[in-house]
Design a protein with these regions (language model features):
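Catalytic cores of secreted/periplasmic lytic hydrolases that degrade extracellular macromolecules
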Residues: 2, 23, 27-213
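Bacterial N-terminal signal peptides
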Residues: 12-22
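Bacterial N-terminal signal peptides that target proteins for export
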Residues: 2-12
Length: 213
């Protein structure tokens, strides 16, 4: 009798251990499935670049550089890296959107290949003062000064009188932007900064491409 009791006790214990094992396995499996579900959920949507001139850019210098080289594989890589960093720094100082300024530079200079009135030696990255062959654009003494002049000109377009410049003025045409704040976003640059009515749309397309980097 006692041996039968021991047998049934051992059998019961074995059943309980087996069930416990199945429970643990089931829980582990469920946990793993939950982790997979969590992993497969879409990540937060990539932040969109603002089209407002007086705003913060979201791309770092490395992303700007990669965008430039993707669009211009034969471009000067060292110069592209340097100018990307300059745009980040100068824009942060004045509160101007560095993404907008950088793609505008790409559009205006054909990715630093130039080819119109403005020539490479001028350090003019946005066509400042370029009207005709008698007025082929302003010349700046360094890349940094040229980038700063570009940012300051955007500042004149994108901000009002109550927002002063932080750096010393190097843009000779800053004072000619009237009224101040005439183009708060890229679309306002069409017909103002450039005669091209599609100018804002062209910048918009470039920004959409930059968002992928």
């Amino acid at each position: 009798m006692k041996s039968k009791q021991n047998f049934f006790l051992k059998l019961l214990a074995a059943i309980l251990i087996c069930e416990a094992g199945l429970f643990v396995t089931s829980c582990s499996t469920a946990r793993n499935l939950n982790e997979l579900d969590s992993f497969s959920e879409p990540q937060e949507e990539q932040k969109k670049i603002l089209r407002t001139i007086y705003s913060a850019g979201i791309k770092n210098a490395e992303s700007l550089y990669k965008f430039f080289i993707a669009k211009c594989p034969d471009g000067n890589k060292a110069k592209a890296k340097k100018i990307a960093k300059l745009y980040i720094t100068e824009c942060q100082t004045e509160g101007i959107n560095s993404d907008i300024a950088f793609v505008q530079m790409c559009l205006e200079t054909n990715y630093l290949r130039y080819g119109n009135l403005v020539t490479k030696d001028k350090n003019n990255f946005c066509g400042l003062g370029a009207i005709d062959k008698n007025n082929p654009g302003l010349k700046f003494k360094s890349m940094k000064e040229g980038v700063r002049a570009h940012i300051q000109h955007l500042h004149a377009y994108g901000t009002t009188e109550d927002i002063p410049l932080k750096n010393e003025l190097v843009d000779p045409r800053y004072k000619f932007v009237k009224p101040r704040g005439k183009a708060t976003d890229i679309f306002g640059l069409a017909g103002t900064w450039a005669a091209d009515k599609e100018y804002g749309a062209k910048l918009d397309r470039l920004l959409s491409e930059l968002e992928e980097f």
